[in-house]
Amino acid sequence: MEVETTAKSYDVPASAFSESAVIDTHLDVPSTKTESIERMVEVYEIERSVQVITSSGFNKVALQFPDSLLADSASVARLIEQRASCKAFILADTSYGRHPPLPANKTFLKLYNVRICFKLLAFLHFSSCCVDEIAAEHADAELIIHYGQACLSQTKRLPVLYVFGKNPINVIECSQHFRQLYPDTGIRVLVFYDVVYNHCIGALDEALSPLYPNMTISTIAPEGLPSEPTSQQSSRNPQASDVEGMEVNQCNRRFGRDFTLAANSSISDYQIFYIGEQSLTLRNLMMTYNKCQFSTYDPITNESRRETLNVNKALMKRYHMIQRAKDAQIVGIVVGTLGVADYLKIIERLKKVLAIAGKKSYVFVMGKLNVAKLANFLEIDVFVLVSCPENSLIDSKEFYKPVVTPYEMEIACLRTQEWTGDYVTDFHELLPGKSINTFWTDDNDDSPYISLITGKMQHNYKSSAKEAGETSTSLVQRNQETTLATQQPLTAEFLASRSWQGLQQNLGDTPVTTAVEGRRGIAAGYTDEGE
């Protein structure tokens, strides 16, 4: 598939300024079409989907596809419509904003040589691993079927059925690589895997569990599924399904995965074996469990290795971002998801935390994140991204200002707490009732400190938790012995630091003139321009 490229100073496609160019634009999408209907029924679990739709009485179903599966989307929708007697709507990804959205159904169908036409084609607001409930609600959908890679974040608005697909994998080869990496059969190993290999984990467990009694294989347990038999779950680790009342094992749940650890042990006592290619899922696991030794097996290349990624170096980079966030005075809270449960709660918590720390905050909802969008707000010192765990870690090298996680922002604001190296990518862990939740008090240290970034003295004009929730019209009793301290507004400081501050007003020098009638019409044609 050919791709049109144009050399420009900014990464903006030339087609963005022409409607005809947008229609004719070809998208470089790595997608292949499944030729056999039988294979499509198996891979996309058509029968399971139909059973869920018919048993629950759903009439409108939204089908969410990533770029890599768009070639099969129309055929899958047709099969579901025919077998479940419902309306199927396609929610398609747009490559994280790198390509212009397709303006019409016919253009989309033409790209993939599809002859069937559906009533609606919507596009995702954020990353394709998250369930886009907003786009589905626009179509009045009653159920979302999410295909392909998924972050398994909890949703609340609509029921979600996950169909991960069945990427090919040689179980025998995988088990051989596992034995080569772990010759000691008594070692404690925790197995994670990409969701697209969930279909073969039962066979892998049967091949390895007799040899490795201390091996634990995680199970995919997404939340938000309609009530239906969880055929994706296997019977491995039976102790994990009956944990209540048992004291021998510890049941853990992270990132939509359940796993059970031995009694009197912690995650740091285990080595982790990951099945899948290099991905956001692997990076998220390595940052979260940074004290564990990771080994990976890639079914595509049939290669395994011990991961030598310097996690400490990555953590040092994140620590640098925390110091940048500590010095920030104006913070932008970027909403990176509208579908993950409790995203509004973490936004409100961040606003309160920033207010107590003496930082001014603004909330931005801008869809898929890119450099150009954030570059429009030069006044912001640092951005906080509220997103799913897999998309919360942003490499800020291309961005003009740092982009940090809610956990990093809280560490930066809480001066009395030192970072131990433990890392949290899931913002749910910061909410009340969770283990990482921090209780804010009014005795937080507000003394000046020396910035590790600039080497200068920094002041944070903190307010109490009570004041953070009050309006500026509240009355307080004045203390007659209080000394006066002045603070220059942050906006004035930023304006004073700019080399160009706007046109000179020349007060008293410019003559006052009578107001006259201006131009009428729109930019395409004003009334005084004629035909």
UniProtKB/Swiss-Prot annotation:
Pfam families the UniProt entry points to: Diphthamide_syn (PF01866)
GO function terms (MF aspect): 2-(3-amino-3-carboxypropyl)histidine synthase activity; 4 iron, 4 sulfur cluster binding; metal ion binding
Record text on cofactor binding: Binds 1 [4Fe-4S] cluster per subunit. The cluster facilitates the reduction of the catalytic iron-sulfur cluster in the dph1 subunit.
Cofactor: [4Fe-4S] cluster
UniProt biased composition (Polar residues): 228-240
Gene Ontology terms: biological process: protein histidyl modification to diphthamide
Alphabetically ordered keywords of this record: Iron, Iron-sulfur, Metal-binding
Annotated residues for binding of [4Fe-4S] cluster: C130, C151, C388
Region (Disordered): 222-243
Keyword check for Metal-binding: yes
Pathway: Protein modification; peptidyl-diphthamide biosynthesis
TM region(s), chain numbering: none
A cellular component annotation (GO) from this entry: 2-(3-amino-3-carboxypropyl)histidine synthase complex
Keyword match Ribosomal protein: no
Record function comment: Required for the first step of diphthamide biosynthesis, a post-translational modification of histidine which occurs in elongation factor 2. Dph1 and dph2 transfer a 3-amino-3-carboxypropyl (ACP) group from S-adenosyl-L-methionine (SAM) to a histidine residue, the reaction is assisted by a reduction system comprising dph3 and a NADH-dependent reductase. Facilitates the reduction of the catalytic iron-sulfur cluster found in the dph1 subunit.
NCBIfam families: diphth2_R, DPH2
Family: Belongs to the DPH1/DPH2 family. DPH2 subfamily.
Protein name: 2-(3-amino-3-carboxypropyl)histidine synthase subunit 2
